[in-house]
Each structure stands twice: as structure tokens, then as C-alpha cells.
């Protein structure tokens, strides 16, 4: 029977239980995200940055601050139309233009071409240069709307000759002049007194030539197809139109029939078998986009295989839109198969790194993290020789954190490592910090072991982030062990930051004396050189009143020689506060002995101690200290004058400085 496909298409559709693409198919499936439908189409990251939907703008800033626990910030890219306008405003050479666009990951699409032209309405030279370049480089991307937009630019800017030349070109290509262009340009002609051109424009419409514009033809065809059940009568009405079907018309008809994919497919088959039109890459892809829905999954599969069999490629616009639909409807497995298929196409037409990143984000945020799908996506991407960039892992990590699955970051890292990826030091820090801060002790240790096994040790920044994370999680014991492992592997050269975080965490947990033991051990046995600020934190906390009474004062004193040996000036302010408030004369004398490498400190230091005690009305303790001092101090004129001028009846009690509480870095 003629057109046997008709009866098949009218059968009730039943979902096929078989996979999207059988494993016998030599075609794999690719995934380029689609706009929802329009926004996703223009968000391409790599070679087609603005064509991926679900774009979470975002690429993480890869630097980690001195805290090493910072989250990557997402770097926002300029809109593609802004980049294109800038390029064509500056450059003229084709090679220069192409190179510049490629370096900015810009790919021309129908929508992008329209946006660029609309932005350039007041710049006809730049618009004309872009349009001419587009005709040569991407003729299939310039639709009837693009032609009309360029026509309007010529008309409203008074470029009459260029306007009529383009009208003639449009007639040859089957494009009509829109009513909007007629009205806008007609007003311009009238204003400029161009009566002949105005009359010519009116005649163009009066002749009825516009009845064959793409939009008009499309509307007539769609009205016939949608009005009745498909049959011989519908086919007769279509033949009676006596239309010469062109690619743009067929594509537009299929897009408008998107609401009824069955009728779109009937029209698609009929127009080919009736000899009215031979399908090209543009119309094949338009049909595939219409069928790319859950209900028509089998037919979509057959269509994209048919595209390849006919010697054409699945356009990125097709991949992007269909992939977006799959992801929106939670068809993640089908989206991965589509990605595999697309990656098996020509190298110049495969999904970009950004599209791969978007799909990976959808996988890790799905109801259940399917690592098999994650691995398949990476294999499809790296199979073409692509290299996984840091930004891809950054996006995935952010997505894991958003669904509280950061603990599974090791699984993700292992899968990416199989493709040859090694995370940068900054990303190692992000993972290490994230795991330890969440209290994922086992996972944090697993990260260290995995990196070692793969021959890539965590660097000093990442180890510091691990220590800091354990500190933030209040797991001081694990933080201490981690720090010891760190200096055991990396040495003490870059341990200052991590050690200060460790000291601070102990002090804020009121365990200054515990961390003092670790402090002394590491300085004496491991030649650790703490920062000056770390010494200050230790001294302040050991001299807190209760801690000082229980032995903290003596421990704080012992830090003064260490400080001196490391080339730092002694930190004496907390000692002055302590001695003026509650310190004994014996403690004051011990301080004076410890603050210098000589037998006794300078007169100025001694005077400072006496003054602090006398100002706080601690005359008895000051007298005791004086009696313990060397004779040259007891006979010193300045010392005697100080005691004379600050006798009890002349000295007013000054409010002592408050004892330091928790110290922050």
C-alpha cells in the first residue's frame, strides 16, 4: 500500500521498554544543554558557550584565600552579543574575526544573529559587516527575520541602494518583506522626501508579492495540516497551494506544528515522498527537535539515527533543546545517552565543556546520585581527546554542596581522575575543607589516601584547609593529628597558617594549656617556627586570670625566649596587664628575667613594670619587687623618683584593662 507509514503513525503510541539507543547502535548519545527553551540555547561555555540551557552562571573563581576554606566564586561572562558587537566594531579581516570569536567561545545561532542585529540598528556599517560575514560563514543561521532586521537597518539609516539590493536578494531566497519594515522604512522615505522609493515600496505590497513570504506560506500550510485529520484531502489541499517548498518554509512549518508532533511527522514524511521537497540538515533537525519529548522517545531516536544515515549531523541547537527537555523532566539517563550520541559526531559539532558541566551537575543533583551515568558522561567527553577543566569540578562541587552531598565528592573526584584529571591545589583545598568542616572524618582521610595513591599528594594549602576544617568542626584531636601528618609529609616551611588556626581553635575552646604542650613540642622537636601573631594568641590566652593561676603564667614566660630565638620582639603588653592586676612580686621578677637574654632588662622596661604596678595601687608588690632587683636598679634616680611621685596618697587607682576573652585571628 502506498504510504504505509501513515497507518503506523496513527497507531496509539506506546512507550518502548528498550533503551534510548540500543548497545548495537554505533551511534552514541551526546548532551548539550538546551535553553528553557530560549535562555539555555545561548549559554554555551566552550565552543558554543551561549547555547546551553540551565546555565547556572557560575564557574567558580579558582583562587583560595589565605583562609584556604573559601568557596569558589562564579565568574560571570559577557553576553555573546556584546562580544560579537565588540569584535565586529574593531576588526575587519575574516580570519581575525573568526579567531576572536572562537577564543571567546561564541557560536552563531539564529537567535544570536537577531540579537546582534537589533543591537546594531543605529550602526549600519557594523551591522552590514556582520551580516555579510554571516552570509558567507553561517548562511543557514540567517533567517527571514534576520534579513528583515538588516533591511530595516538599511532603510531607517537612509541607505536606500543597499535596501533595494537586499530586497532583491530576499526575493530570490523566498523571503518576504515584513509589514513592520514596510511601515518603519516607509516613514523614513516619506520624511526624507524619497517619493519614488516610497511608491516602489507600496507597489511591492500592493502587488501581493508578500503573500509568498515565509510567514504567510507557513501559516497557510499549518492551517491546512492542523484543521483536519491527515488524509488524502489534506494532501490535495497542500498540493493545490502549488508552493515551491524551501528549507526555511519547511523548517518553520515543523516548528509551528510542535504542538502536535504526530502531524508534524506526517507532514515531514509526505513532503519528502511526494517529491515536493528533499530534506536537508536544517529540516531533519527541526523534525528531531519536535520529536525530542518523553512521549515520542522512540521516534526521536530513529530520527537522529536517520540524520546520520543521510550524511548530516545533529545540530547543536537540536541537542541543546532536547537535552534541556530531558533534564527538566528528570530523564537524566536519556540525557546522558543523548550526550554520548552527540559526542560521537563530528568534532566541530560536539557539546562544549560547559554543556558537559551542566549535565554533570544535573546528575549529581538528581534524586539519587548515579555514578555510572557520571562516569559515562566523562568517558564520552574525554574520549574525543578533551581535557577536563578545573571549572567543571568547581561546578560539580557547588552542586553537591547544594543538595548536601559534599561527602560524596571523593567518588566524583575518583571518576574524574580516571579520565586523567588532577585537581588544582585550590580545588584540593575546597574539597579538603568541605569534608572536614562537615565532620566527614573518614572521607577526609580517604581524600588524603586517594591523592597519595594516585601519585599526587595534597599540597600544603589543601592540608592546611583540612586542619582548618577540623578546627571549625570542633574536632581538635583530629585537627592535631592531621597537622602532625601535614608537617611529617610537607615539612614545617608552610605550616604557619594551619598552626595558627589550630592554636586559635584550642584557645577558643578554653584549652590554651593543652595547645601549649603541642606548641612547645612542635617548636622544640620539629623546628616549627610559628608566626608572631600565633605567639601573641598563646600569650594572651595563657595570661587569662584563671589560666595564669593554674600554671599559665609560667608557660607564657617560657614563650618569650622562643619568640626571641625566632627573631620576634617580646610581646609584653598582656604581661603588664596581668602584673598590674593580680601578679605577685615574684612573678614580676620572673618576667623581668625572662624578657631579656641578659641578666636583667633595660631600665626602661623595669620602669614600665614599676609604673604599671604603682598605677594600680599595688605599692606593696612594687616595693617587694624593688627589694629583689639589683642594687643599680634600687639606686636608680628615675626609679626612686617614680616611687616618690606615686606614693599611695598621690596615686589614684586606675581601672585595669579587661582580661582578654576569646581571641580571633
Curated annotation (Swiss-Prot):
Q: Which Gene3D superfamilies match?
A: Tetratricopeptide repeat domain
Source lineage: Eukaryota, Viridiplantae, Streptophyta, Embryophyta, Tracheophyta
Could you tell me the superkingdom of the organism this chain comes from? Eukaryota
Q: What is this protein called?
A: Pentatricopeptide repeat-containing protein At3g02490, mitochondrial
Q: One GO term of the cellular component aspect?
A: mitochondrion
Q: PPR repeat positions in this chain?
A: 280-314, 315-349, 352-388, 389-423, 424-458, 459-493, 495-530, 536-570
Keywords for this entry? Mitochondrion, Repeat, Transit peptide
Q: Which PROSITE patterns match?
A: PPR (PS51375)
Gene Ontology biological process: RNA splicing
Pfam families found in the cross-reference section: PPR
The organelle transit peptide extends over 1-37
Q: Where in the cell is it found?
A: Mitochondrion
Amino acid at each position: 500500500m502506498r504510504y504505509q507509514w501513515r497507518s503506523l503513525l496513527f497507531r496509539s503510541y506506546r512507550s518502548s521498554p528498550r533503551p534510548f539507543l540500543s548497545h548495537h547502535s554505533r551511534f552514541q548519545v551526546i548532551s548539550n544543554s538546551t535553553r528553557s527553551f530560549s535562555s539555555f540555547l545561548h549559554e554555551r561555555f566552550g565552543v558554543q558557550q551561549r547555547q546551553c540551557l540551565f546555565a547556572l552562571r557560575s564557574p567558580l573563581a579558582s583562587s583560595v584565600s589565605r583562609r584556604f576554606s573559601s568557596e569558589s566564586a562564579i565568574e560571570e561572562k559577557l553576553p555573546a552579543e556584546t562580544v560579537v558587537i565588540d569584535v565586529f566594531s574593531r576588526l575587519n579581516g575574516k580570519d581575525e574575526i573568526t579567531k576572536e570569536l572562537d577564543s571567546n567561545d561564541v557560536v552563531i545561532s539564529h537567535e544570536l544573529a537577531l540579537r546582534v542585529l537589533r543591537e546594531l540598528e543605529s550602526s549600519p556599517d557594523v551591522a552590514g559587516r556582520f551580516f555579510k560575514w554571516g552570509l558567507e560563514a553561517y548562511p543557514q543561521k540567517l533567517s527571514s527575520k534576520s534579513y528583515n532586521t538588516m533591511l530595516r537597518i538599511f532603510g531607517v539609516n537612509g541607505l536606500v541602494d543597499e535596501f533595494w539590493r537586499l530586497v532583491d536578494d530576499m526575493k530570490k531566497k523566498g523571503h518576504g518583506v515584513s509589514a513592520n519594515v514596510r511601515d518603519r522604512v516607509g516613514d523614513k522615505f516619506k520624511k526624507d522626501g524619497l517619493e519614488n522609493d516610497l511608491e516602489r515600496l507600496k507597489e511591492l505590497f500592493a502587488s501581493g508579492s508578500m503573500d509568498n513570504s515565509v510567514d504567510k506560506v507557513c501559516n497557510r500550510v499549518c492551517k491546512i495540516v492542523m484543521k483536519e485529520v491527515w488524509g488524502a484531502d489534506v494532501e490535495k489541499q497542500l498540493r493545490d497551494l502549488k508552493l515551491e517548498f524551501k528549507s526555511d518554509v519547511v523548517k518553520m512549518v515543523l516548528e509551528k506544528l510542535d504542538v502536535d508532533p504526530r502531524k508534524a511527522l506526517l507532514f515531514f514524511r509526505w513532503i519528502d515522498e511526494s517529491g515536493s521537497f528533499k530534506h536537508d540538515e536544517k529540516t531533519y533537525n527541526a523534525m528531531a527537535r519536535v520529536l525530542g519529548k518523553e512521549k515520542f522517545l522512540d521516534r526521536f531516536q530513529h530520527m537522529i539515527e536517520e540524520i546520520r544515515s543521510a550524511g548530516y549531523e545533529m545540530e547543536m541547537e537540536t541537542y541543546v533543546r532536547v537535552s534541556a527537555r530531558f533534564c527538566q523532566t528528570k530523564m537524566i539517563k536519556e540525557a546522558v545517552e543523548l550526550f554520548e550520541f552527540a559526542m560521537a559526531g563530528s568534532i566541530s559539532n560536539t557539546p562544549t565543556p560547559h554543556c558537559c558541566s551542566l549535565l554533570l551537575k544535573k546528575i549529581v543533583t538528581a534524586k539519587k546520585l548515579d555514578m555510572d551515568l557520571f562516569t559515562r558522561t566523562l568517558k564520552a567527553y574525554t574520549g574525543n581527546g578533551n581535557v577536563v577543566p578545573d571549572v567543571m569540578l568547581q561546578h560539580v562541587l557547588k552542586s553537591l554542596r547544594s543538595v548536601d552531598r559534599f561527602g560524596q565528592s571523593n567518588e566524583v573526584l575518583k571518576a574524574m581522575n580516571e579520565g586523567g584529571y588532577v585537581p588544582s591545589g585550590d580545588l584540593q583545598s575546597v574539597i579538603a575543607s568541605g569534608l572536614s568542616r562537615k565532620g566527614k572524618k573518614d572521607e577526609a582521610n580517604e581524600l588524603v589516601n586517594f591523592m597519595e595513591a594516585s601519585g599526587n599528594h595534597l599540597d600544603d594549602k589543601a592540608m592546611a584547609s583540612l586542619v582548618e576544617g577540623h578546627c571549625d568542626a570542633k574536632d581538635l584531636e583530629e585537627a592535631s593529628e592531621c597537622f602532625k601528618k601535614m608537617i611529617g609529609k610537607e615539612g614545617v616551611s608552610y605550616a604557619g597558617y594551619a598552626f595558627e588556626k589550630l592554636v586559635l581553635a584550642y584557645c577558643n575552646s578554653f584549652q590554651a594549656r593543652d595547645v601549649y604542650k603541642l606548641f612547645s613540642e612542635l617548636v622544640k622537636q620539629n623546628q616549627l617556627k610559628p608566626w608572631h601573631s600565633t605567639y601573641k594568641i598563646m600569650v594572651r590566652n595563657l595570661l587569662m586570670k584563671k589560666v595564669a593561676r593554674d600554671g599559665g603564667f609560667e608557660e607564657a614566660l617560657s614563650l618569650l625566649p622562643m619568640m626571641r630565638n625566632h627573631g620576634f620582639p617580646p610581646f609584653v603588653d598582656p604581661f603588664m596587664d596581668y602584673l598590674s592586676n593580680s601578679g605577685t612580686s615574684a612573678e614580676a621578677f620572673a618576667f623581668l628575667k625572662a624578657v631579656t637574654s641578659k641578666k636583667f632588662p633595660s631600665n626602661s622596661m623595669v620602669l614600665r613594670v614599676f609604673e604599671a604596678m604603682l598605677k594600680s595601687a599595688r605599692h606593696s608588690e612594687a616595693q617587694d619587687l624593688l627589694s629583689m632587683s639589683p642594687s643599680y636598679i634600687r639606686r636608680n634616680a628615675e626609679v626612686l623618683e617614680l616611687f616618690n611621685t606615686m606614693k599611695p596618697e598621690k596615686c589614684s587607682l586606675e581601672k585595669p584593662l579587661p582580661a582578654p576573652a576569646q581571641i580571633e585571628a
